[in-house]
């Protein structure tokens, strides 16, 4: 009995021992295709550090961090990022792609809140829509509803800067993590973010297993297309946003996906690392010349875009 007490005290002392941020330098998962995140650990610790690099367009040397404290281990000294106590059980997902990644590992039941419920097609989310909170869109967030959902974590994304939700979430004491999947240059890099979300819910091993099969299947299809003799159809992307039409860079994952599928992206002027706005007249001209038009939102006819426009 004395031995057991001593062991318990030793364990408690080890668990409560503080660590330095610099101790979390052992790679727990090294992404093969994604460049926007890394998962690290410290020797003798169950807690992990998820770092997200340059999480929005135009970000330069920006890193946001989420410390996932496990087994009651304390936050490292000097850490000023977000802290998640244990695995996330209640998640608010601000993008439908976050839900798709959680769905890939069978964990959508953890989603308690979303942005734009009517535009999410996931069967589990729609089956539970009466119990899922729609917190609204950035710039018009229902924070009272968000608080009532009692989330462990909010999954965010940034467009041309930090999310407008960030400061309010800090004020409310709600942890968040940026998901920069859409900034990846390859479809496989985008897909690999499911491993980062798997870590957040304590299912990294499952996430790694699910992802491992994706490059195999993707590259097999890519090889099949490259061996076919065909004329590449020209492809237009996206829909109007206000008075502009945002066209992805030729290095964007969506354009890479089109190329790998045997298509020809119609707009080659943007070779940077972010989408660029063009005026509606140029966009409509491109669309009229394209063989295909993808990512058209909820529209099923061109009239939905041409009839409201006086031009």
Positions of the model-derived regions?
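Flexible, glycine-rich surface segments
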Residues: 224, 230-304
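Solvent-exposed loop/turn segments at secondary-structure junctions
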Residues: 97-100, 117-119, 159-163, 182-187, ...
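Stable alpha-helical elements in mature extracytoplasmic
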Residues: 87, 97-101, 107, 142, ...
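Extracytoplasmic substrate-binding proteins
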Residues: 90, 152-154, 162-244, 268-269
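Bacterial Sec-dependent N-terminal signal peptides
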Residues: 1-19
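Bacterial Sec-exported substrate-binding components of ABC uptake systems
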Residues: 14-99, 206-235, 302
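Conserved small/polar residues in nucleotide/adenosyl-binding loops
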Residues: 305-310
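A short, structured surface patch at a secondary-structure boundary
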Residues: 48, 54-147, 153-158
């Amino acid at each position: 009995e004395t031995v057991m007490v001593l062991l318990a005290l030793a364990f408690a002392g080890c668990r409560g021992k503080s660590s330095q941020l610099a101790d979390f330098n052992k790679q727990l998962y090294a992404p093969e295709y994604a460049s926007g995140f890394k998962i690290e650990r410290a020797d003798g610790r169950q807690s992990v550090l998820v770092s997200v690099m340059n999480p929005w367009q135009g970000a330069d040397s920006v890193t946001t961090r989420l410390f996932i404290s496990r087994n009651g281990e304390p936050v490292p000294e000097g850490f000023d990022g977000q802290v998640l106590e244990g695995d996330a059980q209640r998640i608010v997902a601000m993008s439908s792609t976050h839900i798709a990644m959680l769905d890939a590992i069978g964990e959508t039941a953890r989603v308690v809140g979303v942005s734009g419920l009517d535009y999410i097609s996931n069967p589990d989310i729609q089956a539970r829509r009466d119990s899922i909170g729609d917190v609204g869109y950035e710039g018009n967030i229902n924070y009272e509803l968000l608080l009532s959902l009692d989330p462990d974590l909010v999954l965010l994304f940034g467009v041309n800067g930090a999310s407008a939700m960030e400061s309010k979430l800090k004020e409310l004491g709600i942890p968040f993590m940026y998901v920069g999947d859409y900034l990846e240059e390859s479809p496989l890099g985008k897909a690999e973010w499911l491993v980062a979300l798997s870590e957040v819910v304590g299912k990294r091993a499952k996430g790694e297993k699910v992802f491992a099969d994706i490059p195999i299947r993707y590259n097999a299809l890519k090889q099949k297309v490259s061996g076919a003799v065909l004329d590449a159809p020209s492809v237009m992307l996206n829909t109007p946003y206000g008075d502009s039409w945002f066209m992805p860079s030729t290095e964007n994952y969506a354009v890479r996906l089109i190329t790998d599928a045997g298509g020809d992206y119609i707009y080659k002027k943007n070779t940077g690392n972010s989408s660029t706005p063009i005026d509606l007249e140029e966009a409509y001209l491109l669309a009229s010349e394209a063989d295909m038009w993808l990512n058209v939102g909820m529209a099923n006819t061109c009239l939905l875009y041409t009839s409201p426009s006086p031009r």
